[in-house]
C-alpha cells in the first residue's frame, strides 16, 4: 500500500480541495492516460485496487505509471469514544484530486486494450474520469 515513509508531522488539518490541477495534467510518460474529471480523495487502497485491475487486464504487456501519491493522513477516533480529548490517530492516507489531474498512464499496449483496462480501473474509483491519448509533439 502506498504511504509516506516519514512525515514531519503525523497529523494534518482537513483543508479545502479547490481549483483545478495546473500541474500533472498532461500525459508525460506513456501513450495513454486516465484523467480525473471530478474532484475528491483517493485512498491508498483505491489507488492500489485500480492498479491491480489494469495490470490483470493487460497481462504481461505494457507499462503502467501511477501519477498520484497518497500523502495526506486522515485521522479517526475509535468507536464509542466521547467527543473532545484531542484529535484521533491517523487511520489511512489519501491523495487529494482536482479536476484535470492525470491519475495513471500506460504504454506498450494497443488503444483498445488500454481503453478497456482504464475502464476497469475507473470502476474502482469514486471520481469521474476520462481516457486521454498523448498529443503529437508533447
From Swiss-Prot:
<dbReference type="InterPro" id="IPR020798">
    <property type="entry name" value="Ribosomal_uL16_CS"/>
</dbReference>
<dbReference type="GO" id="GO:0006412">
    <property type="term" value="P:translation"/>
</dbReference>
<keyword id="KW-0687">Ribonucleoprotein</keyword>
<keyword id="KW-0694">RNA-binding</keyword>
<dbReference type="InterPro" id="IPR016180">
    <property type="entry name" value="Ribosomal_uL16_dom"/>
</dbReference>
<dbReference type="InterPro" id="IPR036920">
    <property type="entry name" value="Ribosomal_uL16_sf"/>
</dbReference>
<keyword id="KW-0699">rRNA-binding</keyword>
<dbReference type="GO" id="GO:0022625">
    <property type="term" value="C:cytosolic large ribosomal subunit"/>
</dbReference>
<keyword id="KW-0689">Ribosomal protein</keyword>
<dbReference type="InterPro" id="IPR000114">
    <property type="entry name" value="Ribosomal_uL16_bact-type"/>
</dbReference>
<comment type="function">
    <text>Binds 23S rRNA and is also seen to make contacts with the A and possibly P site tRNAs.</text>
</comment>
<dbReference type="GO" id="GO:0019843">
    <property type="term" value="F:rRNA binding"/>
</dbReference>
<dbReference type="GO" id="GO:0003735">
    <property type="term" value="F:structural constituent of ribosome"/>
</dbReference>
<keyword id="KW-0820">tRNA-binding</keyword>
<comment type="similarity">
    <text>Belongs to the universal ribosomal protein uL16 family.</text>
</comment>
<dbReference type="Pfam" id="PF00252">
    <property type="entry name" value="Ribosomal_L16"/>
</dbReference>
<dbReference type="GO" id="GO:0000049">
    <property type="term" value="F:tRNA binding"/>
</dbReference>
<feature type="compositionally biased region" description="Basic residues">
    <location>
        <begin position="1"/>
        <end position="13"/>
    </location>
</feature>
<protein>
    <recommendedName>
        <fullName>Large ribosomal subunit protein uL16</fullName>
    </recommendedName>
</protein>
<comment type="subunit">
    <text>Part of the 50S ribosomal subunit.</text>
</comment>
<dbReference type="InterPro" id="IPR047873">
    <property type="entry name" value="Ribosomal_uL16"/>
</dbReference>
<feature type="region of interest" description="Disordered">
    <location>
        <begin position="1"/>
        <end position="20"/>
    </location>
</feature>
Amino acid at each position: 500500500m502506498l504511504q509516506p515513509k516519514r512525515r514531519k508531522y503525523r497529523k494534518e488539518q482537513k483543508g479545502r480541495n479547490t481549483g483545478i490541477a495546473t500541474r500533472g495534467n498532461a500525459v508525460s510518460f506513456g501513450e495513454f492516460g486516465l484523467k480525473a474529471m471530478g474532484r475528491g480523495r483517493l485512498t491508498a487502497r483505491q489507488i492500489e485496487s485500480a492498479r491491480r485491475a489494469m495490470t490483470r487486464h493487460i497481462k504481461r504487456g505494457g507499462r503502467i505509471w501511477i501519477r498520484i501519491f497518497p500523502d495526506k493522513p486522515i485521522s479517526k477516533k475509535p468507536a464509542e469514544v466521547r467527543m473532545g480529548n484531542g484529535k484521533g490517530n491517523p487511520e489511512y492516507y489519501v491523495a487529494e484530486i482536482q479536476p484535470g489531474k492525470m491519475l495513471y498512464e500506460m504504454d506498450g499496449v494497443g488503444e483498445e486494450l488500454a481503453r478497456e483496462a482504464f475502464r476497469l480501473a475507473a470502476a474502482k474509483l469514486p471520481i469521474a474520469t476520462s481516457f486521454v491519448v498523448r498529443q503529437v509533439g508533447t
